[in-house]
Amino acid sequence: MITEKQLIEIKHLQDECEKFEEINLKLNWEMLRNRKNDLKEDFFYYDKDQLVGFVATYYFGEKVEICGMVHPNFRRKGIFSNLLNEALNNLAPVSTILLNAPEVSKTAKEFIKKQENCTYSFSEYQMVWKEQELIEFTPIVNFTKAVQLDFAFISNLDVVCFGFEKNDAEKYNQRILNEPDRALYIIEVNNEKIGKLSLLRENNESWIYGFAILPEYQGKGYGKNALLQIIEKENKIGNEIHLEVALENSNAKKLYTGCGFRQYNTQDYYVIKR
């Protein structure tokens, strides 16, 4: 578990790093705030009483993502390399290790170039809905709060729509169902389950994750209708609306841009071989 003091220190360091390079770091704050197990997942480097380096690991079933940062005034001292090695040495058994870095971070690119065991894997767009006149629509899908009985359906969607391994999908969704700050919804048409999405609200932002529609129901307007309902609801409460989409998922990107989302950041992922 991370203490409240440590969370404040991490946020301050994040602000310094993002301001220096004009980047957006993906630190998965909902996971940092809800650390529960005994596994060592977060690694800190202090200069006297100041946090100047931080690396975190995030488990998604048999896959782990790693993200970190070092204060601009303390770079080129081996701090990130040491923290990354410490994180790698403390990993639970996993099948895939991914290092995450903002596409525009020159510091990250320089570091990764020097890593012989680091290979580019894929990218994700981070998108935001720009406040505008909402597209007119009539609700044709319904949302119900997911419960444990929906677990198999939800996990199967991640296998079918996102290429998850079954075990990874089950581990990931068990965590999502238990996260207090995130709501997981089933999307239905005529009482038939056709999709799902999760919604995380924090700091006047609403983040849409894991948005998926069964293939046999795609291309019928259900996904767009669901998205427009979420946009309308979150916009009414004054939240800025964000989501992420894989770079290669052109159909999803077309759907999001058609609903008013615009790309503002790209996150790159690199596989680390051990």
Predicted regions located by residue number:
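Conserved donor-binding loop and adjoining core beta-sheet/short helix segment
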Residues: 18, 27-82, 197-209
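Short amphipathic alpha-helix that is part of the acyltransferase structural core
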Residues: 1-30, 137-166
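Conserved acetyl-CoA-binding loop-helix of GNAT-fold acetyltransferases
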Residues: 76-89, 210-215, 219-234, 253-258
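A structural microfeature
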Residues: 51-53, 121-123, 195, 223, ...
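Acyl-donor-binding surface of acyltransferase catalytic domains
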Residues: 60, 72-139, 270-272
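Conserved hydrophobic beta-strand within the GNAT/NAT acetyltransferase core sheet
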Residues: 66, 98-101, 208, 241-245
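Active-site rim helix/loop that mediates acceptor-substrate recognition in acyltransferases
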Residues: 18-48, 163-198
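C-terminal "cap" of GNAT-fold acetyltransferases
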Residues: 123-147, 239-240, 244-250, 262-274
